[in-house]
Amino acid sequence: GGGIKGNKITEICIIVLQEGKEINRFASLVNPGREIPLYIEKLTGINDRMVEDAPYFDELASQIDALTQDCIFVAHNVGFDYNVVRAEFKEAGLDFNRKRLCTVRLAKKLIPGLFSYSLGNLCTSINIPHYDRHRATGDTEATVILFQRCLDLDPEYEVIQGFLNRKSKESYFPPHFKASDFEALPHKAGVYFFKDKN
């Protein structure tokens, strides 16, 4: 807990899609090798007793690496999840590099105008079943349905390709930041005041 640095995985779920359909799945509790902070236990329901006999991440790393070869890493707020997984791989002495796609960004582009784009609120807004919130399998299953809905809204993959294109400015913006807002910024030096919602 407490930011990306120092986070450890206590549970992982991977669902592999091909042409929008599930072709493989892996889920496991993970022993983080340290005490689970109380706020994480309250959020997820996962406690030290539940993970004491679970495998450590380095015991799962090769299997996860093989399962995700040639895959795009898709997650809701992908920057966080990807960096935590990548840090676990690094700690296990392995490299982990995948293309990434964020369902927060996709949803904001393809389903504009919602009050909130948190996974729970988004699922409520567009009628996606979301069981076992804050557990790996429940959140992953909900994210898969959200991603499938985004695929339906982007049949030519134009939006998805834009986000996957590393040269696109938009792929670097925070999820809440619009490219049009960036383009509208003045090009002259000076002092600027930002008010209300940054």
Where are these regions (language model features)?
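Extended, hydrophobic interaction surfaces within ordered domains
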Residues: 47, 102, 106-167
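Conserved non-catalytic scaffold segment of RNase H-like nuclease domains
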Residues: 1-98, 112-134
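GIY-YIG nuclease catalytic motif and its immediate N-terminal context
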Residues: 143-198
